[in-house]
Amino acid sequence: MGKKGQGTEGNKPRKKSKALSYFVRFLAAVMGLVIGFCLYWVYIFGGTFVSVPVVNQEDYSTMDLSEGGSTTGGDVTSSWSNGGHTRLYYDPSHPIIEVKQKDSNIENILVFGIDARGTDDYACRTDCMMILSINKKDNSLKIISLMRDTAVYIGDTEDTLGTRLNKLNSAYHYGGVGEMINTINVIFDLDIQRFVMFDFGSAAEIIDLCGGIEIDVRPEEVSYLNEDLEESRALDGNNSPNITSGGVQVLDGHQAVAWSRIRHLDSDFARASRQRTVATALMTKVNDMSYGQKLQLLNDSAGVFETNMNSADIMRVALNCFACLDNREEYRFPEDGTYTVQNDPWMMLIDFDEQKQRINDYIWGE
């Protein structure tokens, strides 16, 4: 009896060891999947990442800016018609100035499109500028259009602001992505550090990858949409057809971009509203996709846009945005009645202190 008891006791450790072995193998398999997914994610978005230095004001004040110069995210020789994209314009003399995040629950990211006329036209002006303000605390998303004709003083810091008013959309032309972000932060007292950049072709390509987006086109917009579409065909050789009538319809990428760029019909304010509508429709379309479709979209869109966010940042921001889609607001600055107009050249003149207070109250609350 004693031997039998000893034998039974002796088998227990082997059973535990076997169970532990299964658990270790299961854990290893899960870790392998996680690591594999992370490597896949990094592989996909490695081509979108552009390293743009972020420096504090003390380091900026001691920089040697005599060399100047400019650079892009990479090769600019591939034409739009051959699938090329206009690369990010970055001037080493204008790094992004480090700004402390005001609220750890609220992140502000600049999404902008450039008015380039070819892949070598990288030192161009911005066509649209939108701030995605993501509030993790209350799961809300605010999409804020900054009017491109707003008159501002351009510069990296309060001490280096220019003395002559320029349109906000020219900041990118004069000093690349760094000076554009710095100007917005200084003028409006914001804390933007991250950005996403598109050109006409890349925005259209992403919309096409999603199967187009549903837009309610007003009858009076049809001819203007087709005019912009004709211009885009001349620039990049796309074969997107004209639309024939107004109403709710699915627009392909080039049609949607052409619709969002209509300006001569009404105003720049209506134009900014159309751009926000396209952005929201695209985010909603992606959010409604299955997990497999989202992975395929990520794979297909690699290299279509450029950003200074790494793969982990992109994943975090995307998840936060999707979580906030049902609680979103759209707005533009400056607001109606808070600016005057200068006709030659046409610019929107603002009270800087008033607008600074308004946009801060809107993002962070009064």
Q: What residue spans do the PLM features occupy?
A:
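Non-catalytic, solvent-exposed segments at the cell envelope interface
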Residues: G2-G10, R14-A29, F37-E366
